[in-house]
UniProtKB/Swiss-Prot annotation:
The record marks 122, 285 as: Chlorophyll a binding. Homotrimer. Residues 1-56 form a transit peptide. GO terms for cellular component: chloroplast; light-harvesting complex. Keywords: Chlorophyll, Chloroplast, Chromophore, Light-harvesting polypeptide, Plastid, Repeat, Transit peptide. This is Peridinin-chlorophyll a-binding protein 2, chloroplastic.
Length: 369
């Protein structure tokens, strides 16, 4: 059971991370080992509009069969457990970043419409979360699994296995056995067998090559403003301890369900964003990870590219959607958190960065649809 449990944990993580953009969550998603979340997607019925009927039906039908085998297990998992915020073993920030980078590469290669479908499926599933364990409905469980299966089938197998292998490297071998001890072992085995059958259907429909890179604007107002922001804020950036475990700490006084509602706003925003802009942002992050130093700080040039890419993503989303995210995060962020983070850097550099950010925000707002 330990061996198969490890595979189940890691493979389920691969599936979930296909639509994630590094966000911490304690609510429902179809994998017992979650770290962060955020994503892009739509209900399975919407996904079928962007794929051949046979393809959609085959993966959709397989997802229902997986649901038959796994929903009992899903109901036993305590999705509200704070353990999902923890590293799956020893804290290894730089090693974990390599695993996250593989997820980003995989996400960047995925079909934007299928990513959108997966995000919308997650959003819908969050609305039916109930019970003490915070599990979604059976129908939404199936829809999410189908949407994730379609996303994974749209990227080459090697990219999927790169994620699998990188996550396996940072997962303590004792984790699967411990997670298995929290549920009914027979149900876990049945879910794993169902997952393997589902995996075979996804693999049967998998593409052999990835799509080309995103189109990146040159000389646009957001790009120019991003360079100014980066010049003003890079000294501040270099002072941040990117290797700290503070980013894994739970928000004080915030329940799993409260956090999930805030994360849901991010998922909705991701689903509304322009697909090419999201792809470009993922590619910019991948490039930036490639230039980080021993302290986890990227180069000034890559920092500017990331800021520009994020600005373009935000500009592609309605202002009201962006503000929904802002307000949702403000509602779960204790006032002591900004003060604590502020105390760890030079206040003058932090203020200079904030001032530049507000200017950048205005440029993005002017370009917003």
């Amino acid at each position: 059971m330990v061996r198969s449990g490890k595979k189940a944990v890691v493979l389920a993580t691969v599936a979930f991370c296909a639509t994630s953009v590094v966000q911490k969550t304690c609510g429902f998603v179809p994998s017992p080992l979650r770290q962060r979340a955020a994503a892009a997607g739509a209900a399975a019925s919407v996904a079928t509009m962007f794929a051949p009927a046979a393809f959609a039906d085959e993966i959709g039908d397989a997802a229902k069969t997986l649901g038959d085998a796994s929903y009992a297990f899903a109901k036993e998992v305590d999705w509200n457990n704070g353990i999902f915020l923890q590293a799956p073993g020893k804290l290894q920030p730089l090693a974990a970043l390599k695993a996250i980078d593989k997820m980003i590469v995989m996400g960047a290669a995925a079909d934007p419409q299928l990513l959108k479908a997966a995000a919308e499926a997650h959003h819908k599933a969050i609305t039916t979360v109930s019970g003490a364990n915070g599990v979604t409905s059976r129908a939404d469980w199936d829809n999410v699994n189908a949407a994730l299966g379609r996303v994974i089938s749209a990227v080459p197998e090697k990219m999927v296995m790169d994620v699998y292998n990188s996550v396996a490297k940072i997962t303590d071998p004792k984790v699967p056995a411990y997670m298995n001890s929290l549920v009914n072992g027979a149900d876990a085995e049945k879910a794993y067998a169902g997952f393997l059958a589902f995996k075979d259907v996804v693999k049967k429909n998998q593409v052999t090559s990835a799509a080309g890179p995103a189109t990146v604007p040159s000389g646009d107002t957001i790009g120019v403003a991003a360079q100014k922001l980066s010049d003003a804020s890079y000294p501040f950036l270099k002072q941040i301890d990117w290797l700290s475990d503070v980013y894994l700490k739970p928000l004080p006084g915030v329940s799993a369900q409260q956090s999930l509602k805030a994360i849901d706003r991010m998922i909705v925003m991701g689903a509304q964003a322009d697909g090419n802009a999201l792809k470009a942002a993922a590619e910019a992050h991948h490039k930036a990870i490639g230039s980080i130093d021993a302290k986890g700080v990227t180069s000034a040039a890559d920092y500017a590219e990331v800021n520009a890419a994020i600005g373009r993503v935000v500009a592609s989303v309605p202002k009201s959607t962006v503000m929904d995210v802002y307000k949702a995060m403000a509602s779960v962020t204790d006032t002591g958190i900004p003060l604590n983070m502020f105390s760890k850097v030079n206040p003058l550099d932090a203020n200079a960065a904030a001032k530049a950010f507000y200017t950048f925000k205005d440029v993005v707002l002017a370009a917003q649809r």
